[in-house]
């Protein structure tokens, strides 16, 4: 698992209060981890702060799984 993936996982565990074992790449924030729409906004803000990236609203709407978040952040950091 990449450094970005580890950090995303840690943020999700802290913000949603879920067990680390449930935070898999395919885990949906809403369907699998019990997040609501406010939780997803807070997660996006936490990702932005933790990684120093900007995630516009249109991109944030497409981030629904742990893998989506990791891929988006890695792409932004590489740019």
Swiss-Prot record:
Pathway: Lipid metabolism; fatty acid biosynthesis
GO BP annotation list: lipid A biosynthetic process
Molecular function terms from GO: acyl binding; acyl carrier activity
Keyword Cell membrane: no
Subcellular location: Cytoplasm
Keyword set includes Cell membrane: no
InterPro entries: ACP, ACP-like_sf, PP-bd_ACP, Ppantetheine_attach_site
Superkingdom of source: Bacteria
PANTHER family, sorted: ACYL CARRIER PROTEIN (PTHR20863), CARRIER DOMAIN-CONTAINING PROTEIN (PTHR20863:SF76)
Similarity-based family: Belongs to the acyl carrier protein (ACP) family.
Function comment: Carrier of the growing fatty acid chain in fatty acid biosynthesis.
Name of this protein: Acyl carrier protein
Species classification: Bacteria, Pseudomonadati, Pseudomonadota, Alphaproteobacteria, Acetobacterales
Gene: acpP
């Amino acid at each position: 698992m990449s450094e970005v993936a580890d950090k995303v996982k840690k943020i999700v565990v802290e913000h949603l209060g879920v067990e680390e074992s449930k935070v898999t790449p395919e885990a949906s924030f809403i369907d699998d981890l019990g997040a609501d729409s406010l939780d997803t906004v807070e997660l996006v803000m936490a990702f932005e702060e933790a990684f120093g990236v900007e995630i516009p609203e249109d991109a944030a709407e497409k981030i629904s799984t742990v893998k989506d978040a990791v891929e988006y952040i890695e792409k932004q950091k590489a740019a």
